[in-house]
């Protein structure tokens, strides 16, 4: 059964979902119907520690659904260190795909913050897009949050 928990943070409401002990999604926004679990409370604690600058890397079991290439891209994103960025082109070159495809896969990321698609920017240094509620402004806020820690 899917468990759901929404909670407020200094960067907005976050809703997390899990099946058993695997994280299904992290999204921005609030969901009315909730049925939390001890695992979701652990996830919430890690997210709050990340937002406060006390956690640089998450340690959670993720339930990731997608093609092999999508999973490779999301895995590569998790290797980008806290406070650092990579370009869509750098990731595309490493995985032998196109920067546009990397951007599309970032837009399909259902584990925002945990799989840090906000750390991927354009080659010219501009931010590109962000699928989270709040869009590019939230992406900029997340990057600034990490750089200021």
Could you describe each region identified by the protein language model?
Residues 106:
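DNA major-groove recognition helix of helix-turn-helix
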Residues 109:
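The DNA-recognition helices of helix-turn-helix-type DNA-binding domains
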Residues 1-100, 145-149:
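Basic nucleic-acid-binding alpha-helical/helix-turn surface characteristic of O6-alkylguanine DNA
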Residues 59-65, 121-122, 128-131:
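Generic, ordered loop/turn and secondary-structure boundary motif
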Residues 113-123:
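Short Lys/Arg-enriched helix C-cap and helix-to-coil transition segments
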